[in-house]
Amino acid sequence: AGFAGDDAPRAVFPSIVGRPRHTGVMVGMGQKDAYVGDEAQSKRGILTLKYPIEHGIVSNWDDMEKIWHHTFYNELRVAPEEHPVLLTEAPLNPKANREKMTQIMFETFNTPAMYVAIQAVLSLYASGRSTGIVLDSGDGLSHTVPIYEGYALPHAILRLDLAGRDLTDSLMKILTERGYSFTTSAEREIVRDVKEKLAYIALDYEQELETSKTSSSVEKSYELPDGQVIPIGSERFRCPEVLFQPSMIGMEAAGIHETTYNSIMKCDVDIRKDLYGNIVLSGGTTMFPGIADRMSKEITALAPSSMKIKVVAPPERKYSVWIGGSILASLSTFQQ
């Protein structure tokens, strides 16, 4: 969250609401009945953490309202009734969801005006393009969205219910098989940190597996909050490999490369060349080192042999949806 025209968000925090597992015994401590974002993170040991957004779509409106309240009053420190608001939504978001968002903004927060933009389109804006295909992969879901001259092509948008949270789950499982127990919602956050710090995508998965069996070049160690150090080896690339091979976690779905290709093939034959040449990655789950090269390699294998393929991975892609929103909301034509 932040202000239009800024080049980076003012506030970045996980959309988590935590409620105490136990009742407070110390009177006058000012214990809250709910904590949001980083505060919920830091007190996670005594809280039950809930994610109000599932697969990119809001499933718990009371918690979502708490998150928005926290954003306006504690993070940005603004009065929402004084500022127009730009919210973003997942492509193919149900209409009822958008209506509910609008209702809460106008009725609970009294915002003067609001607009809901599609996330992937904003990422493309942020990359300075008006035509291309965006692979947007966050925590709850991934999408491939072809955009031509600024218009998303709804018939060719594909959704993949595979994203950051699934990778964290799969890493939890791999580590549990190795004898480290990670089960609670608080421990999941530790595993997420392991994933973000150490995971990478292999250019050639089979070859990387062979290498990791014989050499220790892949091994890194991670220190848990209690000081215990665990070695992390082939898990580093096995975990995000799921993006290309969802069958590894028992999902019957095409990988992100195939989904991108299928999405391009659903578009008019005349615009495919422009899409192949402008494949833009966006979202936190595209932050793994090695993802652009691997994506390029996989799509080249699927596409016609003479086709020029370009995968763009902007360094700020974790926030490119927000940056695109900042650009859009600061245009005078948009404000009218």
From Swiss-Prot:
| Reactions the enzyme catalyzes | ATP + H2O = ADP + phosphate + H(+)
Q: Name one Pfam family in it.
A: Actin
Per its UniProt entry, which superkingdom is the organism in? Eukaryota
List its EC numbers. 3.6.4.-
Keywords carried by this UniProt record: ATP-binding, Cytoplasm, Cytoskeleton, Hydrolase, Nucleotide-binding
Which GO MF terms does the UniProt record name?
ATP binding; hydrolase activity
Q: Where is this protein localized, as stated in its record?
A: Cytoplasm, Cytoskeleton
Gene Ontology cellular component annotations, sorted alphabetically: actin cytoskeleton; cytoplasm
Q: Which family does it belong to?
A: Belongs to the actin family.
Q: What else is known?
A: There are at least 5 different actin genes in tomato.
Q: Which PANTHER family match?
A: ACTIN (PTHR11937)
Q: What does this gene product do?
A: Actins are highly conserved proteins that are involved in various types of cell motility and are ubiquitously expressed in all eukaryotic cells. Essential component of cell cytoskeleton; plays an important role in cytoplasmic streaming, cell shape determination, cell division, organelle movement and extension growth.
Q: What is the recorded name of this protein?
A: Actin-41
